[in-house]
Amino acid sequence: MSILKKPDLSDAQLRAKLAKGMGHNMYGEPAWPNDLLYTFPVVILGTITCCIGLALMEPSAIGEAANPFATPLEILPEWYFYPTFNLLRVIPNKLLGVLSMASVPLGLIFVPFIENRNRYQNPWRRPIATTVFLVGTVVTIWLGIGATKSIQDAISLGLF
């Protein structure tokens, strides 16, 4: 069940507005009640059902029991801390490592000011921001992979 409101094109004022491109978003299918009352609950319940179904069909393994008297050879953080862990591990001076991590958000703050002359929405027409994003992504993935390697291969990844 949906409600469809069609424009009254016999109205001269409405036709004049539409000719100028000043039409309202009042035509077609309204958000209330169609989307908010019917579509959104179906999507939300479907997502919850999929999550519960996947959790029941494939529960995650608990793993081996913790032994407080046996320490593993190398302790690794959670996967999302791999790049910062590797950065702190390969930079010999710890203060320099912390400052290098603090310089990342400080550098990102200055990107809009560097590129303030460019008013385009398309990211490929904003070369500085696009380059910073792509280089940052590659460096983060590189450091994340390097955290799982030995300290000798942490930067080169054993490739060269």
From Swiss-Prot:
The chain crosses the membrane at residues 36-56, 95-115, 127-147. Gene3D superfamilies: plastocyanin oxidoreductase, Single helix bin. The 4 large subunits of the cytochrome b6-f complex are cytochrome b6, subunit IV (17 kDa polypeptide, petD), cytochrome f and the Rieske protein, while the 4 small subunits are petG, petL, petM and petN. The complex functions as a dimer. Component of the cytochrome b6-f complex, which mediates electron transfer between photosystem II (PSII) and photosystem I (PSI), cyclic electron flow around PSI, and state transitions. The keyword Transmembrane applies. GO terms for cellular component: chloroplast thylakoid membrane. It is found in: Plastid, Chloroplast thylakoid membrane. PROSITE patterns: CYTB_CTER. It is a multi-pass membrane protein. Keywords: Chloroplast, Electron transport, Membrane, Photosynthesis, Plastid, Thylakoid, Transmembrane, Transmembrane helix, Transport. One of its GO terms (biological process) is photosynthetic electron transport chain. One of its GO terms (molecular function) is electron transporter, transferring electrons within cytochrome b6/f complex of photosystem II activity. Its main location: plastid. Pfam families: Cytochrom_B_C. This is Cytochrome b6-f complex subunit 4. InterPro entries: Cyt_b/b6_C, Cyt_b/b6_C_sf, Cyt_b6/f_cplx_suIV, Cytochrome_b_C_euk/bac. The keyword Transcription regulation does not apply. Signal peptide: none annotated. It comes from Cyanidioschyzon merolae (strain NIES-3377 / 10D) (Unicellular red alga). Belongs to the cytochrome b family. PetD subfamily.
